[in-house]
């Protein structure tokens, strides 16, 4: 049986994520402690209690990475010889998680990199009142045309199933709501985001992030990664630096990535908080997706692997 690993991005976070892992597994407790030491913040409080910190990209991103890393390690322990996916695919931030878990970036460095990525995004969007908005029920072509006619709004994520995420100035996004309803939008939902990702607002941080990747990454990949920006497979440092930097200002083409690689695998494992990618995959793939964001999902994945691998 062939399988792929999926890693969620910003927007999948919620209070309590990773808690069942922390309560049941010594490894998870140790990783929470290491993460707290690396970031100099109590990650248990940040993830398990109501607080403002989890709304800041500088902490949201390492928090999401932490839960993905734990899910991967717990599942990896249960597989004879370790996980050997055909490929890994992350949604936005999740691509950084995928690169790390392929072996190119160790745990502490990845925590600091995701923290810096989120912080740079916040700085790039400072004083812009930026946000992101999900539009359901309007075609990609119609939204691309609308964005071309609209100042400070861009298509940021093509998630498939007539779901597109727009990024830009909050007031400009809000002003589009009546037009979107006229165009047939079933739902328009603002995301809990303090930044506008995958758009020109992030151009000021591209070079700095590229430098950070050059310093942090190793040229060591155990499995290939699918690029969000170009839908190409890569497994070396040079390409990772190029494509993770490019991704900042280019839309996430999740739909294309799943559809063009669907026939290569029999099942997808979503590693990390929530089941956002499982939901998207229902519209994109005829293959099952198992979400490993808590102990129940972990048990389901282990049972599946024991039966078929």
Q: What are the functions of these language-model segments?
A:
Residues 1, 83, 183, 221, ...:
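Structured loop/turn residues at beta-strand edges in well-structured enzyme cores
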Residues 1-142, 187, 191, 267-296, ...:
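FabD-like malonyl-/acyl-CoA
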Residues 10-12, 103-249:
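Alpha/beta catalytic cores of group-transfer enzymes, especially the acyltransferase/condensing modules
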Residues 60-62, 196, 251:
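Glycine-rich phosphate/pyrophosphate-binding beta-alpha loops
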Residues 212, 217, 259, 263, ...:
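NAD(P)-dependent dehydrogenase/reductase Rossmann-like domain
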Residues 249-266:
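A short, acidic, amphipathic alpha-helical segment used as a generic capping/interface helix at domain edges
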């Amino acid at each position: 049986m062939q399988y792929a690993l999926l890693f969620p991005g910003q927007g999948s976070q919620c209070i309590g994520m990773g808690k069942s892992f922390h309560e049941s597994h010594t490894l998870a407790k140790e990783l929470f402690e290491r993460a707290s030491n690396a970031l100099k913040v109590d990650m248990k409080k940040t993830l398990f209690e109501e607080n403002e910190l989890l709304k800041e990209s500088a902490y949201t991103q390492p928090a999401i990475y932490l839960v993905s890393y734990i899910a991967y390690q717990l599942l990896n322990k249960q597989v004879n010889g370790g996980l050997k996916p055909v490929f890994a695919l992350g949604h936005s931030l999740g691509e950084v998680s995928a690169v790390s878990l392929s072996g190119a970036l160790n745990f502490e460095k990845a925590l600091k990199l995701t923290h810096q990525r989120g912080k740079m995004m916040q700085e790039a969007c400072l004083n812009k009142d930026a946000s992101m908005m999900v539009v359901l029920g309007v075609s990609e072509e119609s939204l691309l045309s609308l964005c071309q006619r609209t100042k400070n709004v861009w298509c940021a994520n093509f998630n498939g199933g007539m779901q597109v995420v727009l990024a830009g100035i909050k007031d400009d996004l809000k002003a589009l709501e009546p037009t979107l309803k006229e165009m047939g939008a079933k739902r328009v939902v603002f995301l809990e985001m303090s930044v506008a990702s995958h758009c020109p607002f992030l151009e000021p941080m591209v070079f700095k992030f590229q430098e950070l990747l050059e310093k942090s990454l190793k040229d060591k990949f155990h499995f290939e990664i699918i690029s969000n920006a170009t839908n190409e497979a890569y497994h070396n440092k040079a390409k990772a630096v190029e494509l993770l930097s490019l991704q900042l200002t280019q839309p996430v083409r999740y739909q294309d990535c799943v559809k063009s690689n669907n026939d290569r695998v029999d099942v997808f494992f979503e590693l990390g908080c929530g089941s956002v990618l499982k939901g998207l995959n229902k519209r994109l793939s005829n293959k099952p997706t198992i979400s490993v964001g808590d102990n129940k999902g972990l048990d389901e994945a282990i049972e599946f692997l024991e039966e078929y691998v």
